[in-house]
UniProtKB/Swiss-Prot annotation:
The modification Phosphoserine is found at residue 334. GO terms for biological process: positive regulation of ribosomal protein gene transcription by RNA polymerase II; positive regulation of ribosome biogenesis; regulation of transcription by RNA polymerase II. The lineage of its organism: Eukaryota, Fungi, Dikarya, Ascomycota, Taphrinomycotina. The keyword Phosphoprotein applies. It comes from Schizosaccharomyces pombe (strain 972 / ATCC 24843). It holds the Pfam family CRF1. GO terms for molecular function: transcription coactivator activity; transcription coregulator activity. Disulfide bonds: none annotated. This is Uncharacterized protein C22H10.11c. One of its GO terms (cellular component) is nucleus. Residues 448-463 have a biased composition (Polar residues). It comes from the Eukaryota. Residues 200-209 have a biased composition (Acidic residues). Residues 101-126, 172-209, 315-339, 448-468 are annotated as: Disordered. Keywords: Phosphoprotein.
Length: 629
């Protein structure tokens, strides 16, 4: 395999030498084997500048496939008769190579030789270079000639610069005074020279702008590998539209982008994020209500818990403070009753901000003594109540527990179950569990029971019970509870008399309990969603397929028709084209029963008497024909 890096571009081997026939015989004498064990190491840009080595003159063999054990170095002889400016013959370690016989310019006493492992580079003295260049900045002023080069791998920046420079050789034409007038390009192929005159600055700009396409591809491949190994240092592409939507919902971007003043945040009613869906502008400027509400707010990470002070009935008694509530025996008998009461009773500091009662100190002291002696509370609770200073006890009112409230084991909700959590209970209305409304709830609020026996006064169910009731779900004003006597009468008559107490349940429409989650499009039928023409075409196509299969006609999976059947089918098609509107639909049933017809004439593209109906809808007129129209 001939290595194109070793091309030799010689303009005039000897002064006055013009015999080109003998020059063409030179390549046969220059083929010699190369030992790869003594190949040089990679030469980079810094080392190349130190050694003053020439660059490669071809870009397609920078990554050459050195598969052969022996390699022959060839060269090419240029046809230009003009002497190249800077000629630097090379020498090998194994002398002689018969290259010195071409030129004797290296015999200068001041020339120096530099060995790179394979070749010896002999450079002429600097006076020779300065005299030849004559102040013109050229590539050949600081680099060697393209005589015989070893395979090298250069850095990428050098490859960019040299890829275009190696395409051509620049040789000046000098006038009598020794100054160059114009420059000629002599290519490898030896084409005719095209002369043009440019300045050195324009030449440098052209050389920097023109980059070889092959090196651009290699650079793209290298950059792709660079990015794959360093993904963590590269920022991902972010779609600004999607990011702005997400930031708006998360509350990071205001809905009014023109508002940039953040000094008056309390006065700004402009909401951000999900607050737009829960707009309560009346409470925006009320800072006290926000502080009170922030204590009970929950985030996405924590689950909402039932506060302890909600277990108490906070409605003050209408009678005198001396009356004591009737607490169930289950509270005192249960082992956890003391701990539950201690945690459930609110502290005076919590209640002082909400309640402001201005009474005498004597009445407050007597109220504390009465609650200590007669309620049956533990001594620790009494001490905790009396241990507060007088200034804090002033704003504290007495609260009484609900006698029907069982803290240890709460009742199940009306329409669901309690989901047991490690810290609290959650009521779930699942529609599967239900409890008797009469025995559980309505026995406690019979007529006259609250006013006669209890010392409270009339109270509703929501005030006396903490579990959710029907009033929390829907309006139960028309739902009248039935008493125990009514139930006993119904059982004795064996349900002869119909109970109309729960007749309201029959009138509850579907979707009452999931009104906000109800999608209207789910209740529509597919025929209403689709277009009328689309639905009609589907029904007609299904009907036609059913009739074709019933009559035993040929289908696509059957054996192909014979020539006789094909001729008959073509005749039927021609006949169908000539048929009038009335004839075609009157003979439609007989045409389907014909054994030679497969109904293919319906697939032809023709309109039926200007009605705009396609062939698929033509079987619809069979109904009109059978009904007598």
């Amino acid at each position: 395999m001939a290595l194109t890096n070793g091309r030799i571009e010689e303009y005039d081997i000897q002064n006055g030498y013009q015999n080109t026939e003998e020059i063409k015989k030179l390549p046969a004498e220059l083929n010699f084997p190369v030992d790869f064990d003594k190949m040089p190491t990679f030469i980079f840009q810094e080392e190349r500048q130190k050694l003053d080595l020439p660059l490669s003159d071809s870009e397609e063999n920078q990554f050459h496939d050195f598969s052969d054990s022996k390699l022959s170095l060839g060269f090419e002889i240029g046809r230009s008769k003009e002497k190249f400016v800077d000629e630097k013959p090379f020498y090998s370690n194994k002398e002689p190579l018969k290259i010195n016989s071409w030129k004797k310019s290296s015999s200068h006493p001041k020339s120096k030789e530099v060995s790179n492992g394979l070749l010896k580079v002999s450079t002429p003295p600097t006076e020779f270079v300065k005299r030849e260049n004559a102040g013109i900045r050229r590539r050949s002023s600081n680099q060697g000639s393209f005589a015989l080069e070893a395979p090298k791998i250069l850095k990428r920046d050098a490859m960019f610069k040299e890829s275009w420079k190696n395409k051509c050789f620049i040789s000046p034409q000098k006038d009598n005074q020794g100054f160059s007038k114009s420059k000629h390009l002599s290519t490898y192929e030896g084409e005719t020279e095209n002369g043009f005159s440019t300045s050195t600055e324009e030449e440098e700009e052209e050389e920097e702008d023109i980059v070889s396409a092959s090196w651009v591809d290699n650079l793209d491949m290298d950059m792709a590998s660079f990015n794959s190994h360093r993904e963590r240092f590269l920022t991902e592409h972010v779609n600004m539209d999607e990011r702005s939507d997400d930031d708006f919902l998360l509350g990071l971007i205001s809905s009014d982008s023109s508002v940039d003043d953040h000094d008056n945040e309390q006065d700004d009613v402009d909401l951000i994020g999900w607050e737009c869906f829960f707009d309560d502008s009346s409470d925006e400027l009320n800072t006290l209500s926000h502080q009170a509400d922030d204590e009970g707010d929950t985030t996405d990470e924590e689950t909402p818990e039932l506060q302890n002070n909600k277990l108490l009935n906070l409605s003050t008694p209408k009678k005198s403070f001396g009356q004591t509530p009737r607490i169930k025996t289950e509270l005192s008998e249960s082992p956890n009753s003391q701990r539950t009461l201690l945690s459930a009773v609110p502290t005076p500091l919590e209640l002082s901000a909400e309640l402001a009662y201005k009474e005498d100190l004597t009445s407050l002291a007597s109220r504390a003594n009465i609650s200590d002696n007669s309620t049956g509370l533990t001594p620790t609770l009494a001490k905790a109540t009396l241990a507060q200073p007088v200034s804090t006890v002033v704003s504290v009112a007495s609260f009484e527990l609900d006698p029907r409230l069982n803290i240890t084991q709460p009742k199940p909700p009306v329409m669901g179950t309690w989901a047991k959590e490690p810290n609290h209970l959650i009521g779930i209305i699942d529609g599967k569990h239900s409890h008797s409304l009469h025995h559980d709830k309505f026995d406690a609020c019979t007529k006259g029971e609250n006013t006669a026996n209890n010392g409270y006064g009339p109270q509703t169910l929501n005030e006396t019970s903490e579990e959710p009731s029907l009033d929390d779900i829907l309006d139960t004003s028309l739902l009248q509870p039935s008493t125990q006597t009514d139930l006993q009468e119904e059982n004795s008559v064996s349900f002869a008399q119909e109970d109309n107490s729960l007749s309201r349940w029959e009138k509850i429409p579907i979707g009452t309990f999931r009104k906000n989650q109800y999608i209207k499009s789910m209740a529509r039928r597919d025929e209403l969603i689709r277009d009328e023409w689309f639905t009609l075409a589907i029904k007609t196509r299904e009907k036609r397929r059913h009739k074709i299969n019933a009559t035993g006609m040929t289908t696509t999976n059957s054996v192909p028709l014979r020539p006789k059947s094909r001729k008959a089918r073509r005749a039927l098609k021609k006949k169908a084209r000539k048929m009038t509107f009335r004839q075609m639909h009157s003979d439609f049933q007989s045409a389907l029963e014909d054994e030679h017809n497969d109904g293919s004439y319906l697939d032809n593209d023709y309109e039926t008497v200007g009605l705009g109906l396609g062939p698929e809808l033509s079987p619809l007129f069979e109904i009109l024909e059978s009904s007598g129209y």
